[in-house]
Curated annotation (Swiss-Prot):
It holds the Pfam family Ribosomal_L6. The keyword Phosphoprotein does not apply. This protein binds to the 23S rRNA, and is important in its secondary structure. It is located near the subunit interface in the base of the L7/L12 stalk, and near the tRNA binding site of the peptidyltransferase center. NCBIfam families: L6_bact (TIGR03654). Part of the 50S ribosomal subunit. It comes from the Bacteria. GO terms for molecular function: rRNA binding; structural constituent of ribosome. One of its GO terms (cellular component) is cytosolic large ribosomal subunit. InterPro entries: Ribosomal_uL6-like (IPR000702), Ribosomal_uL6-like_a/b-dom_sf (IPR036789), Ribosomal_uL6_a/b-dom (IPR020040), Ribosomal_uL6_bac-type (IPR019906), Ribosomal_uL6_CS (IPR002358). This is Large ribosomal subunit protein uL6. Belongs to the universal ribosomal protein uL6 family. Keywords: Ribonucleoprotein, Ribosomal protein, RNA-binding, rRNA-binding. It comes from Neisseria meningitidis serogroup A / serotype 4A (strain DSM 15465 / Z2491). The gene is rplF.
Length: 177
């Protein structure tokens, strides 16, 4: 059995778990997420805890039980608490402005970048150089943050660009004459 799958997922109060024919549906205050059921993994719900057991003893079934447990755990956390990614803009003239579901970025290009948020992700800009992304799906929030960062990744000489809060950019030394 997978070491990850050995630990059950505790479902907090206010989170509903429904088993469908093809998917596990998790509902909470932050929305609803569904997880497609895999034929190699059996999921049981007892006393507010979800347990994951591999249907057979193959390596793939063990791996899938651990993967399923990790993904469902993230879904339970997402619908109850939510996920947040923070980005900061470092550079002269680099600005961000949120207008509803649209994020306008000025990153030193000749044109402004207009990024539309996907369903389930909200954006806020507490200051012109800070972006806060929130949502219930960890994968989607992380993907959006990575796409925004990719518009102008931090460069290694001055550190200018879009970076995650707390990210350490390894700086290079300038060429010497």
């Amino acid at each position: 059995m997978s070491r990850v799958a050995k630990n059950p997922v505790t479902v907090p109060a206010g989170v509903e778990v429904k088993f469908g024919t093809e998917a596990l549906v998790i509902k909470g205050k932050n929305g609803e997420l569904s997880f497609p059921l895999h034929s190699d993994v059996a999921i049981e719900f007892n006393d507010g805890k979800l347990t994951f057991v591999a249907n057979n003893s193959s390596k793939q079934a063990n791996a899938m039980s651990g993967t399923a447990r990790a993904l469902v755990s993230n879904m339970v956390k997402g619908v109850s608490e939510g996920f947040e990614k923070r980005l900061q803009l470092i550079g002269v003239g680099y600005r961000a402005q949120a207008q509803g579901k649209i994020l306008n970025l000025s990153l030193g290009f000749s044109h402004p970048i207009v990024y539309e948020m996907p369903e389930g992700v909200s954006v806020q800009t507490p200051s012109q150089t800070e972006i806060v992304l929130t949502g219930s799906d960890k994968q989607v929030v992380g993907q959006v943050a990575a796409e925004i960062r990719a518009f102008r990744a931090p460069e290694p000489y001055k550190g200018k660009g879009v970076r995650y809060v707390g990210e350490v950019v390894v700086m290079k030394e300038a060429k010497k004459k």
